[in-house]
Amino acid sequence: MNQLAASVSVDVQTAYIETQSSPDEDKYLFSYTITISNLSNEAITLKSRHWCITDADGRKSEVHGTGVVGETPTIKPNSSYEYTSGTVLETPLGVMEGSYTMVDSDGNEFEAPISAFRLSIPGLLH
């Protein structure tokens, strides 16, 4: 792992959006709020994202895109960037994981991993 990648912390909070979900139609909407912390001594810029989303039936989808929520933020040393986005699953349980392609101040790209996190309706799991 790139030394800078080890200096990027990714924290995730998830929520089930019941008011915009339709379980009878196999539509479960989840939001996720991500905080990306730059623990290094140099600025880094988030260029793109890659997600692998798996529902409870094993269906996988991949998402590749520039930036996050329409931005390619530069995160200063010892600072954080937070955003909220969402995804729709066909099951009440799923998992997301992936990575961010980041660029350091010298223009070198590196991958910052996003550990797997669970999307679940309340009360489904103990």
Curated annotation (Swiss-Prot):
Gene3D superfamilies: ApaG domain
Domain ApaG: 2-126
Pfam families xref list: DUF525
Transmembrane segments: none
Domain of life: Bacteria
Family matches, as PROSITE patterns: APAG
InterPro entries per the UniProt record, alphabetical: ApaG-like, ApaG_domain, ApaG_sf, Uncharacterised_ApaG
UniProt name for this protein: Protein ApaG
Organism name: Shewanella pealeana (strain ATCC 700345 / ANG-SQ1)
